[in-house]
C-alpha cells in the first residue's frame, strides 16, 4: 500500500518463547502440546511458600540473542513483578524485567530493497533499533468455549521462558514489519534458542502504530495491535489500522490511544481496552530473586561461540562458494538446509578432486532447491528427517555431473534413495538400468547403422527437414541395451549427417 500524504510509524513488541527443558523459575517441563494442566507445579502456580530459581539456560539464550543483535549487555540485571489481574495469571503478577533489562540499545537490519516485488522507493536496507531485550515468564492460556460462555484455563504455559524484544519506532510499512519478524525468526532458529513458530505461539507480536503527515517529526497518537498469529496477519492488520487512522485524520477526527484486537475472519480490528502505561502495572522489585550479574568474560565467550549468522553465510556462499545470490538466499533461510548443502558439497569435492567448483556448487544447489525441497514440502519433513544424507546426495550429484544418469534418471534415483537408506546412488541407478552409456566408441557404430538403414530419411534430412533428427535419436536409443547419453547421441548424429552433407556437396 502506498502512502502519499502520510507516513506510518511502527514499533514492535515481540515475545520469543525459548527452547529449554524446564521453565524459567521452576523444574516443570516446557514442551508444546501437552495435555492441559499437566506441566504445572506449586512454583509456576504461585503457591505460598514457594521460591523461584532462575534457569541459567534462559540467561545464556538471552545473551546469545543480545550479542547477535549488537546489543549492549547489562553487567547487572534485575527482575520485577508486573501486577495485573487476569484469570490465567495465578500469582496475580508476572515476573519480568522493568528498568534493568539484560540487553539494550541493539539493532537488526532488514532489506526491503532485495524483495523480488520491491517498490522503487523501498530502501535497500533499514536498521531497526532495539530498545531492549528482557527475560520474563509466560502467563497461562484462557480457552474460550464457542458455546455456553465458559472459559477454561490451561496453566501449562505459566512460567514458560520468554524473551521480549522491544523495537524503536523505526519501521515504515507493514511489509517492513513482516520482514523484521522473518529476519528475527530466522535468527532465533540459527541461534538454536527458539523454533520461532508463530502458529504455536513461539513467536508472538504486538505492534504499536501511528501515522503522521509526511515531513512531520512529531509522532501521532499510537494504538496497539494484538492477536496477529502469522506473518500474513501482521501485514493485514497493520494495513487495515494504518488505513483507518489515515481516514480518521482526513475527517479531522482524533485517534484514541487504545489496544485493538485483530479479527482475521472479519478483516477488521475491535477495541480491547484503553492502552496501559507502565504505572498501571505497579512494577515492584521481586524480593525472591537475586540480581543477575554478567561478567565481560561471559559475553566474550558467548560472542566467540556464536554460529555464522544468516547474512554472513549468505555473503560467503556468493563470494567464496560461487553461488548466485538467489540460491544463497534460499539455502541460508534455514540453518539445517545450509549445513546440509555445505556437507554435501564437501563430499562432492572429495569425489571430483578439482574442476569447476562453481558449477559443482550450483549442481548441488539446484538439486536441493528442486528435488530435496519438493520432498520436504510434500512429506512435511525437516532436512534431518529426509532419509538421504549429504554424502549420498553428493553421490547422486556426482553421477549427474559425469552424465552417468540423465536429469530424469537422477530424479528417479533420488526417489528410490528415500526408501532405500542402505543403497548408494550408483547401485540404485545400476539396478534400474539408468546408467547412461557415455563411450563415443560404443555409440558411434550404432549411429552409423541407423543412418545406413534409413537412406530415404537421411536424404530428406539433408534436403532441409531438420526435424528428422529426433527420429534418428529415437532409433539409436531403441537399439541400445542400456541408456546412451542423449546429448552425445545428438552430437554424433549431427557430426555424421554433416559429414554426409559435405560429401554430397563435393560429389555435385
Curated annotation (Swiss-Prot):
Its EC number(s): 6.3.5.-
GO molecular function terms listed in the Swiss-Prot or TrEMBL record: asparaginyl-tRNA synthase (glutamine-hydrolyzing) activity; ATP binding; glutaminyl-tRNA synthase (glutamine-hydrolyzing) activity
Reactions it catalyzes: L-glutamyl-tRNA(Gln) + L-glutamine + ATP + H2O = L-glutaminyl-tRNA(Gln) + L-glutamate + ADP + phosphate + H(+); L-aspartyl-tRNA(Asn) + L-glutamine + ATP + H2O = L-asparaginyl-tRNA(Asn) + L-glutamate + ADP + phosphate + 2 H(+)
Domain of life: Bacteria
SUPFAM superfamilies per UniProt: GatB/YqeY motif (SSF89095), Glutamine synthetase/guanido kinase (SSF55931)
SMART domains: GatB_Yqey (SM00845)
UniProt keyword list: ATP-binding, Ligase, Nucleotide-binding, Protein biosynthesis
GO biological process: glutaminyl-tRNAGln biosynthesis via transamidation; translation
Annotated InterPro entries: Asn/Gln-tRNA_amidoTrfase_suB/E, Asn/Gln-tRNA_Trfase_suB/E_cat, Asn/Gln_amidotransferase, Asn/Gln_tRNA_amidoTrase-B-like, GatB, GatB_C_1, GatB_Yqey_C_2, Gln_synth/guanido_kin_cat_dom
Function: Allows the formation of correctly charged Asn-tRNA(Asn) or Gln-tRNA(Gln) through the transamidation of misacylated Asp-tRNA(Asn) or Glu-tRNA(Gln) in organisms which lack either or both of asparaginyl-tRNA or glutaminyl-tRNA synthetases. The reaction takes place in the presence of glutamine and ATP through an activated phospho-Asp-tRNA(Asn) or phospho-Glu-tRNA(Gln).
Family of the protein in this entry: Belongs to the GatB/GatE family. GatB subfamily.
Subunit structure: Heterotrimer of A, B and C subunits.
Name of this protein: Aspartyl/glutamyl-tRNA(Asn/Gln) amidotransferase subunit B
